């Protein structure tokens, strides 16, 4: 199992940060590696919502569909892949820190298979860099 965990403090109230980060319409706005993202069914910040998306990583297009399986309004959510090149679970948590909000992105993915398994450390490093960059972009947008 491969794990990426990144955190950032955004100087905005927790509810505003959570609403921005978990709104499916905003994902392509702050995620430079996401080339397509659409709400397929359900409500955007409700359990059962399903989104289809395409991410570009290490020069490859990876198609995914995930379902929001847990939500605690203003605090966090959990997403589980339904159909993905690399199966994963993702948890996003928001907590108060002083006048701002700490956002923690925790994602667990299956290892690449077969011949490509040796690329796991490289893919993990590239993806962690994308997550850090995306959280930084969300911070810039929200604080401007």
Q: What annotation goes with each model-predicted range?
A:
Residues 80-133:
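Beta-strand/loop substructures that line and gate deep hydrophobic ligand-binding cavities in soluble
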Residues 10, 55, 107-109:
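Hydrophobic beta-strand positions in extracellular immunoglobulin-like domains
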Residues 38-84, 97-102, 133-144:
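Glycine-rich portal/gate segments that line the openings of hydrophobic small-molecule binding cavities
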Residues 1-40, 46:
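Hydrophobic ligand-binding cavity/cleft-lining segments
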Residues 12, 29, 63, 129-133:
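Generic recognition of short, well-ordered alpha-helical interface segments
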Residues 3-5, 61-65, 86-91:
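Short, surface-exposed coil-to-beta transition loops
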Residues 15-18, 132, 136:
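Amphipathic alpha-helical segments that line or abut small-molecule/effector binding pockets
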């Amino acid at each position: 199992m491969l794990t990426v965990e990144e955190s950032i403090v955004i100087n905005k109230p927790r509810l505003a940060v959570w609403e921005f980060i978990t709104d499916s319409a905003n994902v392509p706005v702050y995620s430079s590696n996401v080339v397509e993202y659409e709400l397929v069914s359900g409500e955007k910040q409700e359990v059962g919502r399903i989104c289809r998306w395409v991410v570009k990583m290490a020069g490859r297009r990876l198609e995914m569909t995930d379902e929001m399986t847990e939500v605690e309004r203003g605090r966090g959510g959990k997403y589980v892949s339904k159909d993905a090149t690399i199966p994963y679970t993702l948890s996003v948590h928001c907590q108060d820190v002083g006048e701002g909000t700490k956002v923690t992105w925790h994602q667990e993915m299956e290892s690449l298979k077969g011949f490509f398994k040796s690329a796991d450390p490289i893919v993990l490093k590239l993806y962690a860099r994308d997550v850090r960059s995306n959280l930084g972009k969300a911070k810039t947008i929200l604080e401007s």
